[in-house]
């Protein structure tokens, strides 16, 4: 037995080396934990650089503790950061990005290749914008040891825009790195200390769960960057980022340093304050939506657009207008063009490009060719595109609108001709240049080639010329916020149709004429289109369609003053019709809208001026530039004879005429409801920020009516001893920088002693008169 036991042990010795010991089991478990971190990204997504760092740390015995899975990007700093001057670099080399990292009191530069940047933005589940300490709550940040990384959708800084970027907030500075600059592979790297940051304005758009941020910085001009300064000494950096948890991330950034709390504001942009100051657009929309029923426009057409209540809601500030509003305005614009000129243009609706590029299937097709043509061939069955001068195509992709214009598609230009007058080309008009990459535009040449083949299959004409059409991305006015792209599309379209030449050559565009240049129009002018479209929908909803031309009329439709100047009676009737249905948008009615006996309409009608240029914004070039939205307001100015000097006649003054004051010294007339005699009210301009009017009554010189206010609003106070009249409402629209009554206020008087039925009549007859002081 002993012998057998010895033999057994001797046989087992050769295989003892294959048995697992406790130490081997421990190593195996550690290996499994490490390998889990390198699983397929489909299962778990981690930043490769961080995983390699943890892997090397473990095998270098740098730590004995179990490595925790990181959910956020954290950069540890061993010592307090030393603040150094801001620095920016713009490079045309697309091989790598440069990040300035401050450590141990000196700068170090870490190179990050484009693959790493891409993986950060596309493959990571890391919450872009949250900074954490591994041992603490995600939003309880130790500002000494953490930075906040944000992956913006787009960054705009002066004349450059970056689409593949990283933005980092730390306790002492803000860094920007990008590997895609102005749609090229150039790189951009910039750093600002927190002292360089003047203000941060953050806006949140719930509909698309995207934040839009303006960072105001102390001015400096990095090499290769042209900064347009609205205010001397201040630069503007803008970025947008999709992040459903943005509010928490803002708090995380604020927790880095108390100085962020002092400079970070949740606010609206300056352009919106200018565009909507003094007007309660929300009230207007609420009142309109309450009574709004589905609007079919144009009535009776098979492809009419149906505007619903939910579409009206999108006209509120800081919201994106949808395809319904775009298509509606395109239809309106098309109907405004005279039949003779209409044949030069062709307008596609918003669904055309979506169908052409096959956006409903996910990733857009940029090389459609025959397949793209077959998807939309029915759209042009009865239209020959090659007979048109201009073809307009609205584009929506990645929550952004832009416009494509195909010019002279049927024109064949011989190669030996220099500077031909008519050049076939494709124009791309984008209010955030670079947001829609060139690939989206490249689908049009191949589509036009297939369209040409289908139209000329029995001819020998050259069918290869369409793909060779030159594609041009224009330098145009850019939007000043991140939600007016649809309005810019419509304004581009509006102005182009109004100014489109019969013969177009992009190489002959004159910079001095501003056509299709950055100086084409003020950016704020496009933002004001939101209110103009609301006004148009209001009028159409009330049954006043300015685009309907009477069957027996050879002139333009009677929208606010468009008339034959030789026919005074027709002119008066047209103006009456317009002035009766234009209404203010302050949520209340106005005596102006109820005046049925109006016989004149001054060049600067108070109501028209108020609706057209809200907040005192009156672009100097707007009166000279004709657009297809403007006739509602501007053509009333042309229809009436302008008078620089009006005769003052108290005896002939009635409560039905309202004329804007054009001089610093003004005389107002108030008609008392108990007395037909007009009472004079003298305007006194003490300063640019305060306004007073004094009411002079013959019976008692001490009685006065005082209206005072600042640029933010005008408020009325009653100090008249007589009980014959009282102020019921003050409706203001005044430029805060003007020293005259150019945009006048309107006082509506009523008698408290009258019955409610009589008060209606009083509101019609008792109103403020305004004439220049003699």
From Swiss-Prot:
Transmembrane segments annotated in the record for this chain: none
EC number: 3.4.22.-
Disulphide-bonded residues: none
Keywords: Hydrolase, Protease, Thiol protease, Ubl conjugation pathway
Catalytic residue positions: 400, 430, 485
Positions of region (Disordered): 118-141, 548-568
GO terms under biological process: protein desumoylation; proteolysis
Domain of life from the UniProt record: Eukaryota
GO molecular function: SUMO-specific endopeptidase activity
Protease keyword on record: yes
InterPro entries the record matches: Papain-like_cys_pep_sf, Peptidase_C48_C
Role according to the record: Protease that catalyzes two essential functions in the SUMO pathway: processing of full-length SUMOs to their mature forms and deconjugation of SUMO from targeted proteins.
Entry similarity comment: Belongs to the peptidase C48 family.
Protein's name in the database: Probable ubiquitin-like-specific protease 2A
Organism expressing this protein natively: Arabidopsis thaliana (Mouse-ear cress)
Annotated gene: ULP2A
